[in-house]
Amino acid sequence: MQLFASLGIEVVDISINAIGDAYAFKSREMDFTVGAIINIGSETTSVTLYNKGIVVKHSMLQLGGKNIENDIAYIFKVNNDTARKLKEKFAFAHKNHASQYEFIEVSNVYGEMIKVNQFEISEIVESRLEEILTIAKKEIRSLTSRNIDYVIVTGGTSNMANFNYIAKEVFGTIAKIGNVKLIGIRNNKYSSAVGNIAYFVSKLKLKGKEYTMVSADMIDNLISVENKNESYDSMLGKVFGFFFSE
């Protein structure tokens, strides 16, 4: 709170990521069923139980995408930055469709060039993801004895190719990968943040209040003739550039 106050920002409400995830993937089905959302973050994985779209229980696991990167770094003897790039740009979440003949050359921690096989690295990723999702499944069972109608997996790691295969192997047909569509964002990394924006907007609507992402002065500047050719190096451009730059 003190940090925001020092920046001249007034805090009017507090929300949690579990609510944001629910609003990021809100559907009519969720309003009548019991389900869970698993958000695989960098260092932790959240498991949240919902009843009719409302958060009822929440748990955190000390496992995340970093564990996958650590596995890659250890096995191939590469630094953490290289491991992250291999995970995000080359590996698959499941070995299905990974090529045994596809290689990429990278430098290891000894300065030597090594070849990394796509099928082999995908097996490593799949093994760790299976562990994370299996533990999450056990956590769901500890949170409720009721039948689960859906499991949505989100978080940056869920953007990996073939993630749907490993999710369905662990949870069956009730599993699906999150697909953030709000305000044009196409990255599950931002599901909690974007969902919380949607949640806040819905609260304002219920109160009959108007809302905007920019001030009146910014709107005037954006539509003024003298600034009509201004580049996106502005506050608004930076905000949207943050989401769409990747």
Label every PLM stretch briefly.
Residues F4, N39, I72, A136, ...:
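Residue-level signature of catalytic and energy-coupling elements of molecular machines
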Residues R28-K57, I72:
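Gly/Thr-rich phosphate-binding beta-strand-loop-beta motif of the actin/hexokinase/Hsp70
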Residues M30, A167-G172:
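Short, solvent-exposed amphipathic alpha-helical segments in soluble enzyme
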Residues H94, I148-K168:
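Glycine-rich phosphate-binding loops at beta-strand->alpha-helix junctions
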Residues K176, V180-N221:
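Glycine-rich phosphate-binding/hydrolytic loop that grips phosphoryl groups
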